[in-house]
Design a protein with these regions (language model features):
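A short, active-site helix/loop in glycosyltransferases that binds the activated sugar's phosphate group
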Residues: 83-84, 88-152, 326-337
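Conserved catalytic-core segment of nucleotide-activated headgroup transferases in glycan assembly
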Residues: 5, 114, 118, 122-232
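Extended catalytic core of nucleotide-activated donor transferases of GT-like folds
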Residues: 1-104, 110-116, 232-238
Length: 343
């Protein structure tokens, strides 16, 4: 996106790889420099944008000397992370926050509720209008397709083994968990689909199903579990799942994680996605919040009629892709305004 906007983006890395063999092809063309290289050969810097982990304070100071702005972009559910980490992982430490010299805080649209928290944590005075801290969400299929070398596409069911419903939530927090999708499938199964002989694949499901609580208080009361329809898999990336289950239907559920790019990936490839993303309610098969009954109804609509809706579905996915495209002039203008503190 920044290249398309006329900037020369540089990816700051700890050390350069000895060869490019282990570097994804789409990253090979990226400008990469270490902190030492940047300091040895000063460049005109408009902004240093930190994403995820914090940057070496020495580089921050150097960028400030060059007249650049320091922006911290949070793309995670930071308040929840800061609360849950000491509770569930007391021995864990990572440099999520290094409080020094930051000029501005940006957050992704679905984490706008954390903008004020992030500002005060970083000793940055938030604007009176917190929406000025929202960085436009951008997405491009190049990441999914590995720079357009692979083109996964959904195929209608042609054999019994194609009849699969996948739950991809990683089950690592309350935000991304398989419980609501399982309950929606259970509701659908009880409501006239007991003859269904397909499979429910729960990716990374062992984190839930191996617990005593699930085994003793939940699984015994789910007919889809009692009838042997639920199978757990190790955690997998979305492209591998698409290849293994090219005719799958996906059940999704998130809390405070509305712009989950997995939803975009599934719809772009034509896979039926039953999701609860309010901002994309007009796309795919959507339900609201934890509404299990509505999720089950949307599952039935997707299961029974997706093939007939496929072309319209893909057209809508293209509209959504352009809405969030890094090449969309509206997104580029909004990002440029953030960089230069306009508006």
């Amino acid at each position: 996106m920044f290249d398309a906007m006329g900037y020369a983006p540089i990816l700051v890395i700890n050390e350069k790889p000895e060869t490019l063999d282990s570097v994804p092809s789409m990253m090979c063309a990226a400008r990469m420099m270490t902190t030492d290289e940047i300091i040895r050969q000063p460049l005109p810097v408009v902004a240093l944008i930190e994403i995820g982990m914090s940057i070496d304070p020495l580089l921050r100071q150097f960028v400030k000397m060059l007249g650049g702005r320091l922006a911290k972009l949070y793309l995670g559910n930071i308040l929840n992370i800061d609360i849950e980490t000491p509770i569930f992982y007391p021995g864990m430490f990572f440099t999520h926050h290094v409080i020094e010299k930051i000029d501005t805080i940006w957050v992704s649209p679905h984490y706008g509720q954390h903008a004020e928290y992030a500002s005060f944590l970083n000793h940055v005075t938030p604007p009176s209008d917190l929406t000025r801290m929202i960085a436009p969400y951008v997405w491009d299929p190049c990441f999914l397709t590995r720079d357009f070398t692979e083109f996964p596409r959904w195929k209608p069911r042609a054999a019994p083994e194609d009849d699969v419903i996948v739950i991809m939530e990683p089950n690592i927090s309350f935000q991304k968990c398989c419980f609501v999708p399982l309950m929606a499938i259970e509701r659908w199964y009880r409501n006239g689909n007991r003859s269904w002989k397909g499979k429910v694949i729960v990716v990374n499901g062992d984190r839930v199903t191996d617990t005593t609580h699930f085994k003793n208080t939940i699984a015994p009361y789910l007919d889809i579990c009692k009838d042997g329809l639920v199978t757990c898999k190790d955690r997998m990336d979305i492209l591998s799942v698409m290849k293994e289950y090219p005719s799958a239907l996906f059940m999704m559920h998130q809390v405070n994680n509305e712009y989950n790019y997995m939803t975009m990936e599934l719809m772009w490839c034509g896979f039926p996605a039953v999701h609860n993303t309010d901002a994309w309610a007009q796309f795919g098969y959507s339900y609201t919040g934890n509404n299990i009954d509505l999720a089950a109804k949307q599952l039935e609509i997707a299961y029974s009629g997706h093939t007939n809706r496929l072309e319209a579905y893909k057209a809508n996915a293209n509209i959504l892709t352009w809405q969030h495209s890094p090449y969309n002039p509206a997104n580029q203008l909004a990002w440029d305004n953030l960089i230069h503190a306009r508006g």
